[in-house]
Amino acid sequence: MLRVEFHCHTIYSKDSLLPVEKLLATCRRKGIDRVVITDHNKTEGAFRARELDPERVIVGEEIMTTKGELLVAFVKDRIPPGLPPLEVIAQLREQDAFISVSHPFDVMRKGHWELADLEEIVPLVDAIETFNARCFSDKHNQQAQDFAKEKGILGTAGSDAHAAFELGRASMVLPEFHDADTLRTALAQVEYRVSMSSPWVHFTSRYATMRKKIGIGIPAYISK
């Protein structure tokens, strides 16, 4: 069985200062066997991490569509933000990616989904995120869990970590998998190991965003 972190960010995200190397070291220390790196609208950090630890790292992306965010694993090519969700999903299907929906009911997040828009895409995606450790209220996770049960769709859980101490806060234990198809099969046997993060973690993201805007201590290879 594998312990999986399905939702995390690196310094390549606009609101994280977590170096790729530190993320990988923390995953090893915490016994995280697979990590899906889902930077905001970018894949450079995930590809760099996979070069360093190809067995542990799965390339992902958190993509902002015109309606809400999608959380994707086994990405081959970056999808830019700002496209309609149906267009993004079609492009991801061409890549044989696994598609989940980020924190769909967390109305405190910019990337949450209106119910009508979520209903439209549910038949076209593989899962929705039924537990996100950074949700401002656990009721948003409960709404996602109830919705997934009603629709008979798989659920993913993730820490949404933007800092090293958050990694593994919400993880999944799964049988071996190696691509989107085997991940779908494995999720039918998922065991969730989850706990909520303090709302204070969001200040780490705001601090990272501010640092990048003014360019303090940010490596030259990272765009603001």
What are these regions (language model features)?
Residues 1-25, 44-48, 52-59, 65-81, ...:
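Charged catalytic cores and adjacent phosphate/nucleic-acid-binding surfaces used
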Residues 25-41, 97-100:
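Divalent metal-dependent hydrolysis catalytic cores, especially in the metallo-beta-lactamase
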Residues 90-97:
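Short, charged N-terminal beta->alpha structural module
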Residues 102-106:
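Acidic/Gly/His-enriched mid-domain segments of enzyme catalytic cores or analogous surface patches
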